[in-house]
Amino acid sequence: MTLESLIKELNTVRHPHAADKNHPLYRAAAERWLESLAMADITTIDARLNPQHVYPQVPALSGSGPDSAGAGRGVMDLLGVTREGRLAVIELKASEDIHLALQGMDYWLRVRWHMQQGDFSRYGYFSGVELQPRPPLLYLVAPGFRFHPATDTLLRYILPEVECVRVGLNEDWRRGLKVVFRQ
């Protein structure tokens, strides 16, 4: 297969209006596709979010410090800030995943810790933004019918200071993001 034919195939099958929705290239890396659409207009998720300050695939470290031996590592889908300066952890899932709420909460705890340490300004994140000392917002974003049934139950047990917003998207989100509910 030549590079030209590969590019042609990608343009045909990795497209929002592709005829074959079951093609492996159409279905591959769905979460990254969703992430790219959210990055293109983060205000679709919430109008309060500042489109000038959204970071994809942010390393999330935990432990007694970012350089501590044995620190937990992860990668947040999106880290943003509201127009008022409040941090926002945005966890995306393109399909049903029982870990969505717990993963989001894990990243929320890490972001709060780094916020309290002053790490974001120290490392050049959110340049020119005065970050609020309030706890970060947590957004759990997925197609509306793709939230795992256990998500609501798990959310009842998270810390009371966590302001969590479930954002349900249209099922055909590849054609453009539309919010069908916010809870």
Model-derived features: where do they sit?
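Charged, terminal alpha-helix-loop-beta segments
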Residues: 1-183
